[in-house]
């Protein structure tokens, strides 16, 4: 649509930042909004597909540099609703903000299940599978729906688990799954 084209034009004309060797637009990048757009819009603009790939690659590069899983999105956390920015509107990278506050917070980011499933549906990589296994070992049984996520900590006994089961998480997981099923049948 013209609206999504305008957003992409603005994003790609804003300059670039480099994070762990991956170039990203210097525009506000949140995983939920990006992947919802990719999975829900028909006839995706190639720039949207490229942007999703760059965001994925930046997560993998972050892991390769730090050995810590991240799957930046937005949602519940142990300190309230948060926004995990891959890139903030002013060009900072890998920043977490509590909703309603205009400053960054220092906390282990939540590895959001919905973002991990998005990575799996699009790329089915070893990195995405390993992150999914990490969450599977950390979270409650998904028989009533998938929990939001958990932070990264080698010691499972002190991981901050976000056990809430919500429509935003499960809706994006379903959209990612449907996208993967449809894409594999093409």
What are these regions (language model features)?
Residues 1-186:
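Ser/Thr/Asn(+Pro)-rich, low-complexity disordered segments
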């Amino acid at each position: 649509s013209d609206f999504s084209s305008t957003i992409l034009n603005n994003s790609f004309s804003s300059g670039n930042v480099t994070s762990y060797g991956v170039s990203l637009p210097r525009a506000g990048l949140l995983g939920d909004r990006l992947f919802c757009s990719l999975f829900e819009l028909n006839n995706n603009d190639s720039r949207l597909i490229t942007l999703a790939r760059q965001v994925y690659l930046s997560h993998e590069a972050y892991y390769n540099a730090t050995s810590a899983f991240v799957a930046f999105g937005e949602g519940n956390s142990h300190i309230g609703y948060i926004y995990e920015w891959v890139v903030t509107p002013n060009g900072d990278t890998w920043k977490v903000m509590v909703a309603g506050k205009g400053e960054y917070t220092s906390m282990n980011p939540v590895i959001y299940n919905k973002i991990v499933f998005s990575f799996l549906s699009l790329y089915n990589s070893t990195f995405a599978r390993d992150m999914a296994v990490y969450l599977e070992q950390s979270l409650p049984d998904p028989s009533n729906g998938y929990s939001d996520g958990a932070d990264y900590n080698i010691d499972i006994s002190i991981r901050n688990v976000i056990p809430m089961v919500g429509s935003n998480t499960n809706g994006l997981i379903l959209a990612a799954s449907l996208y993967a099923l449809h894409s594999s049948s093409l």
